[in-house]
């Protein structure tokens, strides 16, 4: 759980945080008092939480009352027919026919206890209960606004089709024979890899479907947006916002605009804004080309009514771009990027959007690391979903999904409407025609619940269960042939690569235009540790032959090779004893296992310990930290997710044991620097000499190890046959 915030702290927060713990939602109870703590009862007394415990209809998670829309509590059809309420009066002024019908639908959805409120302005703020229904209420796409603008579009938006435009070659005018060939190669897992070095110490792995060894070449790097095939409307603004691409961004821009799948594992707070602008430009370019093509063909068909013209320019449903983000503030940043590029004359419901999604940064977090503020700054609520619709001059926020061009959502927010308990209400057809899927800040999503991301990816580009007003005569053939997943472009940005994200690359990136993995060369987090003294760091490798057995073998190694020495040193006297030992445990399940062992095993009888996990109460966290700093606790168990959400500076640390390496290399540096938090220890030469770090790893920790010790060292440490212990000073 992240530190409390002024906004965005809804009841869904805990529901999105990774695998469910096998016990109660709160761990570490009274852990600071004794080694025989009550936490064992906590684990044994409750079954595993339901994965969707806490899912409600409340969307924004705010405690603030809805002020801009009257919510009618209706108990009968007669009450629903009433038209004298202020809400209906306002709607009648705007649009007496269509909007009143919509209001009636909304009242039927709102009868579960909603309270009336006064109307304050024209931007009607929907209730949180209504929002979940509204995004799917109208399941037929509306072309009326687009058709009304067809003549206007001809004046400035009509552009000649460019055969060299990747939009034409990959989306609009696919070669069916070549597409069939590449799809078959992908199904047969026939990929050819091209590797190369990129600027800024990155390396590229470019995979292409190629079963016959044909000639392929990687897209050339681009230095400015002038080299991109953009809509005329976007050209000048793109040049202002993205005047040039430097370093690895030149290659990323080229791959993105050529519709290749991209996994970029070098996202940082410093390059996040440029990546966001680049992806916003690409998304807008794709949406505008798609919609303008439809509008132009609508006008053509209306003029040439006597000709038998076949037009294939659509998918099953309207949404074409899906953006998965970790927080509402991240959504605000992405939408702001879209808005500044598009420059609409009007933005409908923007005030409501900013009220519900934006929040100022917490001033008390000024000392927090940049990556922490980048993820949790502003409104860090992880339960949201919103649709954007584009017309020639307007961006419409909160458009219903089947009338939206771009959908932005958190994994939890999207899954709650896709996976309802009532099977009749389950719906994912709005994802059937997604052509660009963007997953930003994937490493942040890992600390929520990655299963939601996998679930969404599994439901992309499936054949729809209903027609939703689709004109099948205009659906592109590769949709009808169930090949959309091979055309869809997937773009994933992450700060580091993990097995889960790598699995996404392997299983869900199946693009006929190829897929690229851009990885950094690491010098190692151990080279970035800032301590005024030299600390001995020991890495111990244990043999693990099978991934599923890795947790058991790790636990066995810890209890037989590390814990006995720790138990002896804790009872010892002098500077070299084991008091002040922090045990960092990445997995919550491993944390529970180790905690229970400390509480029940005779081997740990004389060890006083505390435990801090992501589920520990705030008061218990503070108490455990205080007692550990004062020496009343010899050992403190600490999880990676607790550090992710809190970023504590823990005092009193003299020895560090990494039960497993952290996913985030920044965490390794921060944890090791705990050794420099106690001036009293650093002042004494004997005390400083006894500070040490020990880390345990196996071959399945290859990604983690590379980030911590460096790319070259990691390879040697994993392959070394002369020994399993490696020391760094």
Swiss-Prot record:
A single GO cellular-component term on record: small-subunit processome
Record carries keyword Nucleotide-binding: no
Gene3D superfamilies: P-loop containing nucleotide triphosphate hydrolases (3.40.50.300)
UniProt GO MF annotations: rRNA binding; U3 snoRNA binding
Main location: nucleus
UniProt feature, compositional bias: Polar residues: 85-98
One of the GO BP terms on file: maturation of SSU-rRNA from tricistronic rRNA transcript (SSU-rRNA, 5.8S rRNA, LSU-rRNA)
Pfam families named in the record: Utp25_C (PF06862), UTP25_NTPase-like (PF22916)
Biased composition (Basic residues): 1-10
Annotated compartments: Nucleus, Nucleolus
Stretches with biased composition (Basic and acidic residues): 110-130
Keywords: Nucleus, Ribonucleoprotein, Ribosome biogenesis, rRNA processing
Record InterPro entries: P-loop_NTPase, UTP25, UTP25_C, UTP25_NTPase-like
Function noted in UniProt: DEAD-box RNA helicase-like protein required for pre-18S rRNA processing, specifically at sites A0, A1, and A2.
Protein family per UniProt: Belongs to the UTP25 family.
Protein name, UniProt field: U3 small nucleolar RNA-associated protein 25
